Amino acid sequence: MKLLLLLCLGLTLASSHKEAGQDVVTSNFDASKIAGEWYSILLASDAKENIEENGSMRVFVEHIRVLDNSSLAFKFQRKVNGECTDFYAVCDKVGDGVYTVAYYGENKFRLLEVNYSDYVILHLVNVNGDKTFQLMEFYGRKPDVEPKLKDKFVEICQQYGIIKENIIDLTKIDRCFQLRGSGGVQESSAE
């Protein structure tokens, strides 16, 4: 009897571990499950000046919407001259989890890893004239995530040649939360 109980316990644990692993998706993405509210958590680039204060790629996601043609519509905030402003970008689907958008050059990004209820990791390549750089973004469903997920992002960035010093933890700065859910411009005093 004890052996049977131990066997059942072992199978239950193995089953729950397998189910937890299935939460992470790396292909065959369901865009409808990506839709909704998100928070920018971490930002990384091999050209750090693009993600530093006043950098063109220092943006904060608020919302992702899926359009009828499978494009993704993003609502972002960014700071311009110390003011938080909203802006929108529509990204055209070109493959499974692969999208393009014109923004400070031509951008192609790929969903690397998604846990629909917790986080999204994106890898973007920007080409602007003869200059090219990479950008990695980590979005969470909540304003912050567990340290182990941040560590995972650091490891993934390093696999793409982005050093730890080029990763910015956006949870430590003003992410223009005062504009979330509204539309417009608002002064921001913190950074």
Curated annotation (Swiss-Prot):
It comes from Sus scrofa (Pig). This is Salivary lipocalin. One of its GO terms (molecular function) is odorant binding. It comes from the Eukaryota. It is found in: Secreted. Residues 1-16 form the signal peptide. InterPro entries: Calycin, Lipocalin, Lipocalin_CS, Lipocln_cytosolic_FA-bd_dom, Maj_urinary. Coiled coil: none annotated. Binds pheromones, the pheromones are released from the saliva of males and affect the sexual behavior of females. Gene3D superfamilies: 2.40.128.20.
